[in-house]
């Protein structure tokens, strides 16, 4: 290489380039590696310890993720490699220019200019430790350098207008904070003799709490800014370099619920709190100030917190809310008057319809009730004897029903005497069975077009009041029914009752009625939401339509939402009934569906069957025999098989044999000659049907019903200790054939109440069988039936039953049997 090589790299001319070959004998290389190492050790610049406040970049409004932050590590390299490393990071557009002079913006100066430029590049004041200074908040727990215009957290003090706050440092709150702030200084910083290397490692360890000079959250949010004494301008902290920013300090340790500050109470356990209220406020809001770093966030997110089922949490919250006591009602009742307490005898005089009164009533009330019943029985016997000799009077059963109604009215008047019921009385709404309502199978043998039983036998729906004595706050409504009992209803049929509600307040009430079940068996037929005027009353119609054989129990709620008033009424009913029908080859039905006629050659022996094949429940039957004068045969003159009272199982029948003494038959023929003809003059279209057909020698009265209702009557008699007579009939004094042993009411069954007596009276039925010894009289009675039916060519019978709410019209119009000639 004789000629000098042209080298215009830095616009300079080198004097000489040694390009002679290397001598093989020279052991040392041209490149001295040890010299380079020594050069690096001499010229290395240590990174300042407190590099978190360094940086020449302003903060960004968004917080980048920790994993996405790129850290640039600066190292001092040899001058020969510095230019190449710098040029490697330059853009491609800049590197496309081969002239280094255009990049460094100087044309002359030589090697000294390059060194000066390099020193400026690597100067401490121009060094960027991190590409994004925001990462210092996540890496070392320190807040990023910010100014008041680019800070994402709200400023506590206005830097220009707000005067310095007057903080009472002697307050127990701030005094406690300052005391705890001093406690946060680690012990390693308090010992001056500690190793410096250990201190540096603690500074770089994120798990070790930072000191007060490095923590951005160590001071209270209330006194984090220092102010100048002369002006209100905030004074920046002095432990920073010029050109670096530091925003207001704040505490985040108590914001997050899962923060370790809520679990670690070791710092404040040794302090004595002034009051319990201050301790509660301190534990929830004034938590210890501590720097939040990455490891703390990781422990919170990946701690021992277990996932909880949402439904389980909601159920637990519902149970806690249900366990809370109800809100007290602080309304002042200015119209409430104190009613004096009545004597015990007067308060318990109405125990016939009271379900919650004491079972052991006083002797006075029992004596009065017994006397009243004896008087009624005497009146019944006298009326029966008078009816036997008077052809224009009503039948015996009608008289007994009238007597029972009178006895009920007397009992009702005694209950209402003295201000009505007490607050412990209970009235049960039951289906009615009075003169205006009839049964399809002839309870008392009367027919009617009425189709709905709406009132109880004791008129508890419309006349029995719930009482005038109230405990506590006055109630806006007076509900006369405390319980609704439907009894036994046939499957597929419907029975309706009415529940009366009266507004006793001085303003309108929006009343809502509902049931606690969605079953269609019980339905409220009227509007479920009704406005009731003051001092007015309404009636809710409730229907019971059983779909299968069984017992149905629901709760009906009547409430006034605006006044937080609610009244619950239990309702129960049985699906399925017994259906008794007499069967015999010689038996024929008369015009009345509950009356039959039968011809027998011997009056001393009467035999027939009672069938319950169409019934779905067990039933009972009780038999009584009367002569043509409507006198009941004495027990010594008649015998029954299997017994006067017996049980017929469902889907079965039972044969009945009756034996009459011959001596009574002869006596009856002599004494009954004149009365039999007079009884035949009674009108067949009268509302009170005769119980014996003209020419009949005897008639049998069969009373029947569901055995489950008679069992409740027996339990009521055991509970009250009083004998129960229903319309003069005794259903409990003797043992019925095939009846079961009386047991206590099982748990969950409707409770035995005094109203079960009225429910039984409204549910039992009966039919009559007329016995003829002469075929001529028997044919006359049956032909009279056909003649009465054919007397009106357009006669329609309306069949009704107490167990229906619809009227079934059976077209039994008889068309005369006439022959029409064929016209050609």
From Swiss-Prot:
Changing residue 615 to E: In or188; results in centrosome duplication defects resulting in failure to assemble the bipolar spindle. Pfam families: Cep192_D4. GO terms for biological process: centriole replication; centrosome cycle; embryo development ending in birth or egg hatching; microtubule cytoskeleton organization; protein localization; vulval development. InterPro entries: Cep192_Spd-2-like_dom, Ig-like_fold. Residues 111-131, 304-324 form a coiled coil. Residues 59-70, 207-225 have a biased composition (Polar residues). It is found in: Cytoplasm, Cytoskeleton, Microtubule organizing center, Centrosome, Centriole; Cytoplasm, Cytoskeleton, Microtubule organizing center, Centrosome. Keywords: Cell cycle, Coiled coil, Cytoplasm, Cytoskeleton, Developmental protein. It comes from the Eukaryota. Signal peptide: none annotated. GO terms for molecular function: molecular adaptor activity; protein kinase binding. GO terms for cellular component: centriole; centrosome; cytoplasm; pericentriolar material. Residues 16-27, 35-44 have a biased composition (Acidic residues). Residues 81-98, 349-366 have a biased composition (Low complexity). Residues 16-98, 189-252, 342-372, 433-455 are annotated as: Disordered. Interacts with sas-7 (via C-terminus); may be recruited to centrioles by sas-7. Required both for centrosome duplication and maturation. Required for pericentriolar material (PCM) recruitment. This is Spindle-defective protein 2. It comes from Caenorhabditis elegans.
